[in-house]
Amino acid sequence: MRHEHYDERQTFVNYKLSHHALMILFVMLVANALVKSTFGLWAEPMAETIILILVPSIYYVTRSIFADAYMGRRDSVRKNVFWFLILAVLFIVPSFTLYGDPIFDSGLTDTAAPLLTGIFFLFIAAAHIASLWKKDDA
């Protein structure tokens, strides 16, 4: 994060939210260890890693977008939405055409990772659009 693009409030909010996301990650790692030791594998390693990364990331991105701390002074919402939609398409389309089933024997397979990542990018674009609507209503 380059500090010259963010004001003091945005920097403080980003630090606070990143601390929260880190705490969520710690709790999820402990919960993952308990689930794996009690019930066995619930997902293959790549899908498990993606889930453990995406949940705190979704928290951080959503809260920072709606707190107006995600983008710097020079960033454009439309440009961000465009690029996140492009990334979503680049991850989601191949996951349906090139890879196998994302769920097998009641567990996530490694082929779910690109699909989950694409959904994450789609979520970021939707959060940006929702924040624009929220600003227009205010």
PLM regions: where:
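Membrane-interface helix termini and inter-helical loops of multi-pass transporters
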Residues: 37-42, 98-108
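Canonical alpha-helical transmembrane segments
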Residues: 57-71, 127-128
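Generic alpha-helical transmembrane segments
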Residues: 47-64, 87
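Short, charged juxtamembrane terminal tails flanking transmembrane helices
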Residues: 133-138
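Small-residue-rich segments of transmembrane alpha-helices in multi-pass membrane proteins
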Residues: 79-91
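Hydrophobic residues within the alpha-helical transmembrane core of Major Facilitator Superfamily
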Residues: 27-31, 58, 126
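N-terminal signal-anchor transmembrane alpha-helix
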Residues: 1-39
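Hydrophobic alpha-helical transmembrane segments in multi-pass integral membrane proteins
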Residues: 29-32, 88-103
